[in-house]
Swiss-Prot record:
GO cellular component, one term: nucleus
Gene3D superfamilies in alphabetical order: HIT-like
InterPro entries in UniProt: HIT-like (IPR011146), HIT-like_sf (IPR036265)
Subcellular location per the Swiss-Prot or TrEMBL entry: Cytoplasm; Nucleus
Binding of AMP, residues: D59, I60, H128, L129, H130
Catalysed reaction, written as an equation: adenosine 5'-phosphoramidate + H2O = AMP + NH4(+)
Lineage of the organism: Eukaryota, Metazoa, Chordata, Craniata, Vertebrata
Residue intervals of the HIT domain: 32-143
Protein name (Swiss-Prot/TrEMBL): Adenosine 5'-monophosphoramidase HINT3
Sites bearing N-acetylalanine, chain numbering: A2
Protein family membership: Belongs to the HINT family.
Chain's gene name: Hint3
Length: 165
């Protein structure tokens, strides 16, 4: 079910911005990932990201042993809303995902899937990078849901290639 996008977009972080974050990042009170990024979902453990404009947390329905979501604090609907100006942000999201795997001593990056679901196949309408490893552990459904460069899921490499054109 898609997350409702109505609500207060552009509202400042109700808890106040953390040091180094954009003072006016878009906030949608109806978006669960905006609330997670603002620290308003206490059951969601946030992991440190070097880039203060991002948050990282575990997926609630992991497809493999390691399944993290890297999310910009700024509300961006999906990968369809990105352009060349977002390349650096996407690259930072990838770096944050790799760091999470390395912290867990996972370094076989040939067995990692990183990518985004494409609307209307997004369960939450807030941009989020899936960082999943090891891919060899995927069951039948995960192989389908996270199928590389399908109509519903695109890899980071595919997205960056499109953004650079």
């Amino acid at each position: 079910m898609a997350e409702k996008q109505a609500g207060l977009v552009g509202e400042p972080d109700p808890e106040g911005s953390s040091p180094g974050t954009s003072e006016s990042w878009n906030y949608d009170s109806n978006c669960v990932f905006c609330r997670v990024a603002a620290g308003q979902e206490p059951k969601t453990e946030l992991f440190h990201c070097e880039n203060e404009d991002l948050v990282c947390f575990k997926d609630i329905k992991p497809a493999a042993l390691y399944h993290y979501l890297v999310v910009p604090k700024k509300h961006i609907g999906s990968c369809k809303d990105l352009n060349k100006d977002h390349i650096e942000m996407v690259e930072s999201m990838v770096a944050a995902g790799k760091t999470m795997l390395e912290r867990n001593n996972f370094t076989d990056f040939t067995d990692v899937r990183m990518g985004f679901h494409v609307p209307p196949f997004c369960s939450i309408s807030h941009l989020h990078l899936h960082v999943i490893a090891p891919v060899k552990e995927f069951g039948f459904l995960s192989k389908l849901v996270y199928r590389q460069d399908s109509y519903w899921f695109v890899t980071v490499d595919y997205l960056l290639e499109k953004l650079r054109k």
